[in-house]
Amino acid sequence: MITANLVLKTSKSTPLNWRDLIACTEEELSGFDIAALNLACAAGLPGTSQLDIQSCLRTLDSWAKEIAKATKRCQWFRQNPQKYNGSFNLFRVHVMSSVLRVRFGFRYKPEMIHYDENKETFFRAEELFIHGLIEGKGGCCSSMPILFVAVGRRLGYPLKLVRAYSHYFVRWDSPKERFNIEVSNSDGFNNYTDDHYRSWPEPISPEQERDYCLLSSLSPSRELASFLFERASVWHCVADYRQAVDALIWASVLEPDNLFYNSMIFPELDKWNNYLRILMPRLQPEIRYNLPPQRRYPADKVSAAVEKEIIGLQVVQGLLAAPEGQEMWQLRVREIR
């Protein structure tokens, strides 16, 4: 459907399981809706039992249709092209931003405006993933740019997701034109330069920009890795370190050159280990276990030592959680005494 030079695309079906998605090639991932990838990584998190992914995707389809109609009707560009630096594409993005905010409640969640990254914060799935925005609850810089990209791509816009320091923004990225789009603010729309994000929200060094893969347009596999990191953040907040570590490792597998993900794995393993130690009895029997013959993670991306530590912690957690494990644990402690 062509409407005012807009190519309207509706969502494609997708394997709505992130474990299926991590096995896909880059080319295969590029065929999936970014919204579906994001929601697949949200599925199964605390607070998502009522999440209807297909309903969310249909809502985004309907929003895109309304934006296409509004863009066709709008005469702002003809009346004042200088306001948009003579760029019809910048005008189209402005219209999309306005319709999302005014018509569909696209906004930053008030409770998250004063987020302090130096303090422990409890993140909910609805805040870090796009279903919270679709449901009208608001979002943050972890969800607003993703939804913006998802709707824009339905309109045929060449939008990319970009990472800054603890922040995401959007980029119009085509061979003919390139500009940034800041959508996670309360006053509407801005298009800052890359240099702006080198000093905001926090200054970044050239080494951080390189090692953390910042300010580059993300490929589909990097997008998926980002969503798995957000998944890990939610599991971390509810102290399910087993799930958090698993999501972090798969994020690092998808994006091995991003040293930030790798740097987060060992602290999370330490938190998991310390958490289990609190639950253990004072007298601890020796635990022996055999490693499975087949590796859980790609051997060229995750060391055998890390995988062994994960399996060991998982065994201990299983013994502590299962009634039969607790009974066996207590029996062995009595034998040691």
Regions found by a protein language model. Give the residues of each.
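A structural boundary/capping signal
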Residues: 1-337
